Amino acid sequence: MNKKALKALLMEVAVVACFAAIACVYFTPALKGWRLTGEDNSANDGLRVEINEYREKNGGETPRWINSIFSGMPTYQIAPSYDSQKTMTAVEKVYHLGLPDYVWYVFASMLGFYILLRAFDFRRWMSVLGAIVWAFSSYFFIIIAAGHLWKAITLAYIPPTIAGVVMCFKGRYLWGFVVTALFATLQINGNHVQMTYYFLIPELLMFGAFVIQCIRKKKVAHLVKATVAIAAAAVIAVGLNASNLYHTYKYAEDTMRGKSELVKEGKQEDQTDSGLERSYITQWSYGISETWSLLIPNIKGGASVPLALNATAMKHADPQINSAGYYNMVGQYWGEQPGTSGPVYVGALVCLLFVLALFVIPNRNPWKWVLIVSTILSILLAWGKNFMGFTDFFIDHVPLYSKFRTVSSILVVAEFTIPLLAMMGLKRFFENMGDAQLRPQMLQKLMLSTVITGGICLFFAVAPTAMGDCVSSMEAQSIRSQLDPQSANMLLSSFSEMRAAMLTSDAWRSLVIILIGAALLYFYYFTAKNNKGKVSWKTSSAIGALIIMVCLGDMWSINKRYMNDSMFKMPAEQTARQKTPVDDYIIQKSGDKRDYRVFNGAVSTFNDNTTSFFFNSIGGYHPAKLRRYQELIETHIVEEYPKALAMFAPERADTAAIQQAGGQMFPAYDLSSVDGDTVCPVLNMLNTRWFIYGDDQRQIPLENTLAYGNAWFVDNIKVVDNANQELDALHQVSPRHNAVIDKQFAQVVGDKCEPADSADYVKLTAQTSTTAEYEAVSKKGGVAVFSEIYYPGWEATIDGQPVEVARANYVLRAIKVPAGKHKVTMTFDPPTVHKTEKVAYVCLALLLLGVALAAFMEWKRKNNKEKTLVADAA
């Protein structure tokens, strides 16, 4: 390696080290092993318990099913781990230098965007600047703080994926294929399909521009080669993730993101042909005026945290209102979203450079229009219900768009395109400094850009309420409905004044940053003018370093509002959840084998996973729960819970059975006089043996002795025609004695059965996450219903012979059992997993072959070059 090449390599190593240092400094607690305490982070802890226990007992194998939340569900979107991914996981660890969690997410984001800009032939310092402003966009830190780590990881790999595509466009087909395939594989492996899907917008527009460019220049051969390389890379990436993608796709059909089989009257206009309801898709829609947060972070108050926590706002607080505690009850955010963890802010100086790019980049440059159109589409779609006609068009006509909720998150595309176009504009500005004719034009365009961006900031700084009071319509309506007009007006006026102060402060802040950035560019201009277009390396480097420092300082300080050291805790503090006296009592009474379920009403039952630390829960939290189970929750479970609590009336207390656990006394009840089939039949068929009543201060365990158990024989079969009838029938018949069967499963268990004998039984004898064994005894044979959730892939055998599994009672499993004593085994080991794994291994081999071939061709090229130089010298 010659000195020039060695120097270049060392510079790249220095850049990588710089990125690592920046990420490490920001996440100092992570270097000590501390973990975030974000809501979704904590929610995942309960999920991991059963999965980790299974892995410990099965040589690290990941279960494809868990029983601990929502009465049981697949793990395709909880722990999407497959053996074929191990090689790429090892590659990923090398790529992020083995840095700790959180640290490497930001490091990988910076490195990925740096690779992209280098593929575009940007100077090193500009590539560093672009990498920092992309990675430090506020949204990325907000999602890390919230525990949306898959999203952060996926986003980190999108820029280098596009870098590979750019390399193909530039004729480096083999390396372009390798880079695209490698990072597309890692991107998809990040397991946030929504982010990958959204970025198809700029990617398809880029490819379209490339096609047009090739056709105009009559470079058809180049177009074909590049297209083949990109397509091959896409096939390899998809194939390597075949197991995850296939099962995610199939699973989505059965989740809340799939189309419901229920026909809901009166909601036709809210339905989509497939996917979520329109109101659910657009529940989190970015406000139109809220879009100014790209330039001014507190345009709508920032995050939904108490107003009392903002020092700037409290300077304008009313002492009388403050003493009443209202400022602790109202949030800083006043936008139209239900709530938010923070704004989408891309940086004030970045916005200046973006506007500058609109003027300095020639209109004939296709990249300019690709990035502008992508930015506009991103913003319009993020508005969601605030621009419903446009959103409806995408929901109705764009494939798969209706599968994703929280449309505001599509702003990540703008967070990508704005910095990229800004860097292109900055590059053009510096390049044109050497041209005496273009130089004055650059100055004029810089001044115009400064006036536009700075003027917007100045407008909001001096007139923060010009576009209305700083109070949301929902907030105003709520307060006016609870207070008399005078009190409501006083409160709303105070809130508006305090929030206006926050907006004013941030508007001035953005203006100052814009003026500093503009001053640096002016200085570069005057240096070039006074030196006939030439600027020394030292001056250029100094200005570049100052621009980097301004951008990093700006975005660092904003991100610290939403992601800071106080949000970390030592692992022992965060994850080591100790058993409560209630937990001890339940385990003492019913054991810890997880062969029963618990309804925990002392927490937000269907938004909390803490119950799953020690028990199989009726509730839980996961954004992609099974759709039928969600419909059962809405139609039956929520309705039955209050009735179930009423069973434990004081007159049924069994004082002789009161027991103690953990130093506390807990009541017991005699439910022999209660008809469980009419009070809470659905909860009973789910084997809900325990209810926990109370709140976070005091919990009371209530034993439900009426639960049906793990399985039972029924007396009758009720065949229905559709999902509506199936769900409604549970209001009319007792699941203890009847199996409600959709007609599509009638051939599996028949349309009638022999009534169960009093001596018939089905007993659970062994169970793991993915298997269950039963002893079934019946005099005449019959239909057995199991208190386990039905899902395609569950297979059953009777004495080793396979039998079909039917769906009963809307969500449960049922099989037909012959007379006599039999061993029933249920197993969840979907054959599709093994088939897709074979596809993944083939694609892995092809990728490794491509890497080896690219390395060989690069070695051959350099070797031939050296031979040529030696020959020329001779």
Regions from the PLM with identified roles:
Residues 352, 689, 731-874:
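Active-site-proximal, structured, solvent-exposed surfaces of multi-pass membrane proteins
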Residues 11-49, 233-247, 377-380, 456-462, ...:
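Transmembrane signal-anchor helices characteristic of membrane glycosylation enzymes that use polyprenol
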Residues 112-128, 164-173, 357-361, 425-428:
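Transmembrane alpha-helical segments of multipass membrane enzymes and assembly factors
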Residues 129-142, 179-186, 406:
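Short aromatic/hydrophobic helix-turn
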Residues 59-81, 299, 304, 309, ...:
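Extracytoplasmic/lumenal acceptor-recognition loop(s) of multi-pass membrane glycoenzymes
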Residues 147-156, 168-185, 193-234, 363-581, ...:
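Contiguous transmembrane helix-bundle modules in multi-pass membrane proteins
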Residues 99-113, 342-357, 414-423, 510-518:
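Hydrophobic alpha-helical transmembrane segments
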Residues 22-116, 120, 132-155, 269-346, ...:
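Membrane-interface coil-to-helix junctions
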